[in-house]
Amino acid sequence: MTSIKRFVLMALAFALAGLNTGHAYAQCPTLSESSMDQALIWSGQPVVGKTYKVQSWLVQDGDSLGLPAGHRLRLGQINTTEMASKGRPAEAFAQQGKDQLTQQLRQQDVIFLQLLPAIKDHYGRWLVKLYDGNGLNVEASLVTQGLAYVISMDSQGAAQCLWQQEKVARSQGLGLWQASISQVRKASILTAKQGGFMRLKGAVTDISQSQHYWYIGLEGHVAIKIAKLRLAWAPLRITSQTQLEQWIGQTITTRGWLAWRKLNKKQRKKVLSRV
């Protein structure tokens, strides 16, 4: 069977051009004193809905930390740029993101975290909301300075306060939102050399689905893969293919990780690829 290639983007956030999902600006809430007082000691077997405290950690980059016994944390509502690795240079503002996280957690006796419902990412890292020793939202600190993109690794989506703080940072051209860095790429002109985390836009051409995912085809050779549960939540509340097919011909702006996948014709028709 003849095989072809297609870009597949694991979408973590997207919007229709002109779709208004705005909310009034709000500061992200701090962790309450009662939550900090009642926080459980991290044991490596966390439960969703509980608050945990950690007394020893190592900042690995702007959105991840290492804990004793090999446990790893990933901030589940943001993404910072990549540090230098395996001969590849650091991306813009990667070091600043790591430095900001390090500075905020420095001289803290304890930090607090809450597990996201998704629990872990595909690298085995615990997905968490992170607070410093004073109960301040660590992700918000990075977003407000333009050092992180808001994403959603959970079907319930990232906190609205983070989206609003990102909007302000973007309007002020802070950090990653400088024009030369934050350009949205066009799906129609992607090449096989491009990949990784990016912001992308393109006109919708087709819709397909699997048991748990929607696949939104864009002009060129791009398919957006997004969990059905994520679209079922507010503000979109999309639960049927008929609803999504109304988007055909409209332009979508999205962000996520892009991979170049080799698919056979049957797979391409259904766009059932794994990222």
Regions found by a protein language model. Name each.
Residues 10-19:
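Bacterial N-terminal signal peptides
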